[in-house]
């Protein structure tokens, strides 16, 4: 995945220099990570297929993920760096950290960042937290995250592995929300209804 991102930004002089700097001195990422927006721009990544805005990769997203992937650090150092960049970053930087997690050798030691993102009301962070690394969320936290997506209007297509993880407990939670909305004459999203049906079928 990171090779694909680097290829999409091939020819970007800033990223080439930044990558070399990070490979030579991992501490350089402290200043280069925030600068990716200026260095590579914030436009959609070249060649990015059309899709929901919350799942679209931007050039600065890709550049930051590439920089993280090029860090040559032992796991403990990498985990500490990832936490620091997330803690000190703005929303765009935090989203990039979350998007990078599936491709970093951090085990489950950054799962707390998912919990932090899921406590926010920023749909970009919530969506990024539910990518492949969300496999480290325990079932209860994952179900609550899916429910939060429905409340926030975040498309459930952003939830990695929802077809595999949907279960009876999620079906019960979604059905309860569906009933509440029906009683209040409020719409229940089509994608949530599809996941509810899938969860009911998988638990039958």
Where does each model-flagged region fall?
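N-terminal alpha-helical scaffold/docking segments in eukaryotic complex subunits
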Residues: 1-74, 141-204
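Eukaryote-skewed repeat-based solenoidal scaffolds used as protein-protein interaction platforms
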Residues: 63, 67-173
